[in-house]
Amino acid sequence: MELLPPRGRAPPDSSLDSASLTSLDSSVFCSEGEGEPLALGDSFTVNVGGSRFVLSQQALSCFPHTRLGKLAVVVASCRRRGALAAVPSPLELCDDANPVDNEYFFDRSSQAFRYVLHYYRTGRLHVMEQLCALSFLQEIQYWGIDELSIDSCCRDRYFRRKELSETLDFKKDTEDQESQHESEQDFSQGRCPTIRQKLWNILEKPGSCTAARIFGVISIIFVAVSIVNMALMSAELSWLDPQLLEILEYVCISWFTGEFVLRFLCVRDRCRFLRKVPNIIDLLAILPFYITLLVESLSGSQTTQELENVGRIVQVLRLLRALRMLKLGRHSTGLRSLGMTITQCYEEVGLLLLFLSVGISIFSTVEYFAEQSIPDTTFTSVPCAWWWATTSMTTVGYGDIRPDTTTGKIVAFMCILSGILVLALPIAIINDRFSACYFTLKLKEAAVRQREALKKLTKNIATDSYISVNLRDVYARSIMEMLRLKGRERASTRSSGGDDFWF
């Protein structure tokens, strides 16, 4: 198909990719009737990213709510009034205009615009493979096209890619992390800035230096010892000295308290520090111990009934010590990925709970009425059947409650089978999301490590002129490490059946 250049202009560069244009109907451009093109009064030229297209106002009038449809109306109004300054002006819809040649300029992607032209021809929008979903969405939104206009053959793949791109928006997360990192590391204000900065690096960057790595290992050991000690304190073993366990508990709490206080003293914005989830977890890990001491010290003059109530409060507070396990999230990428996955998959988790609730309600009721007439049945009530249905649908099957009749066994078989099918659907989505979050965090950690190494190397070169290091090789190694992690991510996604997510 031949594109008609405007008068006084050279024809478009033949190097442009015209293969995709050959499939476009000529009605989008200047209509060709009996070998004679329409007069230029019925058309105008748009220049998108350096590529020029002559469009028909009649074809664009079918889409009045799009940007080009509005531009066609404005251009027609300008011609009738004979002035570019008509209200509204074409400059409100384009980046620049040439009224002499009737040409309007758009600083947008010419490659994406070819799909927009195809939409004007057929009324259907297809997703281009070369751009990411969010970039393509920005383009069609600029041209005033709703993403719901995407054809059914591309709609499912597009929305899956869009969801994954929004979830793993690496650039935005990196910028937020860097801005937060810079705000917390502003040690120029306050006392002892050098000491605070070094102490902060040891506390928050386990891989920054040898002291930081040693501190990270010791912190993990204290968390593990504290958890084991908490378990041993609940067991009445004759060979264990309770006083020794209490001393060990005091030592662990002292370490956790000192670690939290040092972090609190190092930061500049302490209110923001207390609002962060890892710091809230650290605070909840040590507060029950001190609250327990306070309650026990104030209960000396209480009556017997009040002492029993205080004892219940103390037991509840001691249960909160299990939150110390979450402190390992500072040192474990997997735990952080799990937290991100639960946060991002709340809809899938809610859907999973809904499916389980419906199945448990139905099968427990049917099983109860099928087994209630049997002597010495274990299905004594519907709540007991709830427990049986829960263990059956989750394929745990403790065996403490089991059916005896043939009808009950058939219902149990249907319950187990439905549980397998119900759990398989959301868990597959959650598993894919967890894998994506895990490898994204790995990429971020690798990027942070390489950035810190480059900064340190550059600083050493600036201070010592005898050091000879090829920064290009260092940068190449960092890129290769991130590509290796990205390759593992793609392989994991491909093995889980998520090939369509990557492009």
Swiss-Prot record:
InterPro entries attached to this UniProt entry = BTB/POZ_dom (IPR000210), Ion_trans_dom (IPR005821), K_chnl_volt-dep_Kv (IPR003968), K_chnl_volt-dep_Kv8.1 (IPR003970), SKP1/BTB/POZ_sf (IPR011333), T1-type_BTB (IPR003131), VG_K_chnl (IPR028325), Volt_channel_dom_sf (IPR027359)
Q: Where is this motif: Selectivity filter?
A: 395-400
The record's principal subcellular location, in a coarse class, is membrane
The record's keywords, sorted A to Z, are: Cell membrane, Ion channel, Ion transport, Membrane, Potassium, Potassium channel, Potassium transport, Transmembrane, Transmembrane helix, Transport, Voltage-gated channel
Query: Topology versus the membrane, per the UniProt entry?
Result: Multi-pass membrane protein
Q: Please give the residue ranges for the topological domain Cytoplasmic.
A: 1-213, 268-279, 335-348, 431-503
Q: Please, one GO biological process term?
A: protein homooligomerization
UniProt GO molecular function: potassium channel regulator activity; voltage-gated potassium channel activity
Q: Which domain of life is it from?
A: Eukaryota
Q: Where do transmembrane segments lie in this chain? A: 214-234, 247-267, 280-300, 313-334, 349-369, 410-430
Q: Which family does it belong to?
A: Belongs to the potassium channel family. V (TC 1.A.1.2) subfamily. Kv8.1/KCNV1 sub-subfamily.
Its function, per the record, reads:
Potassium channel subunit that does not form functional channels by itself. Modulates KCNB1 and KCNB2 channel activity by shifting the threshold for inactivation to more negative values and by slowing the rate of inactivation. Can down-regulate the channel activity of KCNB1, KCNB2, KCNC4 and KCND1, possibly by trapping them in intracellular membranes.
Name the record gives this protein: Potassium voltage-gated channel subfamily V member 1
The protein's organism comes out as: Bos taurus
